[in-house]
């Protein structure tokens, strides 16, 4: 069976209850006949102390639930707009050709999948000390841990296919330094140690109301010439890594551009999976409907004939939810869609959408 048929993405939701009850309700919905690779919870803690205590509770529940087969675990502080708590699940229907190993490094669980197509790394939930350190120090700490995991498993940094970056108060400044710019500088330092001749990863850089810096990633080293990664550009948009300095805000006068592609695909023989980066359209003075329409046009350009399997929608204002949901229903996608309240990386952006498509 092709990798594209074995990898699955789904979204589960639950109504408002206590945090523990919501987690239990979500875990009860998970598929029993698949290997769970990644669990990403999206919720709304009251402050960073509660965020940390809930993250610890989550980890304890997941360890008890999965034992030695602990998937990657992330807790993202983004208020869900269509649920009390949202769970995004990446799972895999393994066959006799697949070898899956569950490991931990520094307390962080990660998963390695090996088969005839190559080796695949699923890692994440990587975070620093949210309570005691600032964004710059947390960013450096997260990339250091990422490097350690990748070195340990023999994955070069330039084989990252998809990266999710959650940045507390992304457009806020600490003195002259913007949080997003501090993160971009740390990412550029980490990425600068290698050559990216096959393009940067697909990525999302999105605001979180709490939680400091949190990073998830997928990486791949291919074993057959018929399996490979391809960076995808959109002729309608400027490549993010080619932004001018004026787009970003100085962090100690060092302005590294965001290092990501608009999308990246993995091809397996005649099939492919497309990871769509966080996509938005920088239109000043237009409403949500126009931004959403152009964003979906951009996504259509990126995926070609591939079919969307899942979307995440980030909205700048809670009040946009009903309009966004109705507009997307008009596309008749019939796929899982999650809606979160989150700051997008530039003030004029009202909506950002990311997703996964398969052809």
Name the predicted role of every residue range.
Residues 1-164, 169-301, 305-359:
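N-terminal presequence-like segments and the immediate start of the first folded domain
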């Amino acid at each position: 069976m092709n990798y594209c048929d074995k990898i699955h993405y789904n979204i589960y939701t639950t109504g408002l209850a206590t945090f523990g009850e919501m987690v239990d309700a979500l875990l009860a919905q998970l598929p029993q006949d698949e290997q769970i690779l990644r669990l990403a919870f999206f919720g709304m803690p009251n402050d960073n102390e509660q965020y940390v205590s809930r993250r610890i509770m989550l980890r304890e529940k997941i360890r008890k639930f999965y034992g030695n087969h602990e998937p990657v675990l992330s807790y993202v502080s983004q208020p869900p707009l269509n649920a009390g708590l949202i769970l995004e699940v990446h799972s895999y229907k393994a066959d006799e050709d697949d070898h899956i190993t569950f490991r931990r490094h520094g307390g962080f669980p990660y998963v390695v999948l090996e088969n005839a197509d190559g080796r695949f790394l699923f890692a994440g939930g990587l975070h620093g000390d949210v309570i005691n350190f600032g964004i710059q120090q947390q960013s450096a700490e997260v990339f250091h841990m990422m490097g350690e995991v990748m070195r340990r498993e023999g994955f070069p940094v330039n084989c990252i296919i998809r990266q999710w970056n959650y940045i507390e108060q992304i457009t806020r400044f600490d003195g002259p330094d913007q949080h997003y710019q501090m993160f971009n500088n740390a990412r550029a330092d980490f990425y600068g140690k290698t050559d990216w001749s096959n393009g940067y990863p697909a990525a999302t850089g999105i605001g979180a109301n709490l939680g400091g810096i949190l990073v998830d990633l997928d990486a791949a080293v291919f074993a057959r010439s018929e399996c490979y990664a391809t960076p995808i550009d959109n002729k309608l948009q400027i490549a993010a890594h080619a932004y001018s300095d004026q787009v970003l805000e100085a962090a100690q006068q060092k302005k590294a551009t965001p290092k990501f592609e608009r999308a990246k695909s993995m091809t397996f023989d005649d099939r492919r999976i497309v990871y769509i980066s966080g996509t938005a359209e920088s239109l000043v003075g237009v409403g949500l409907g126009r931004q959403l329409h152009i964003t979906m046009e951009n996504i259509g350009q990126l995926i070609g004939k591939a079919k969307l399997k899942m979307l995440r929608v980030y909205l700048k204002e809670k009040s946009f939810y009903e309009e966004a949901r109705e507009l997307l229903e008009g596309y008749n996608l019939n796929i899982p869609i999650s809606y979160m309240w989150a700051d997008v990386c530039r003030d004029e952006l009202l909506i950002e959408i990311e997703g996964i498509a398969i052809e």
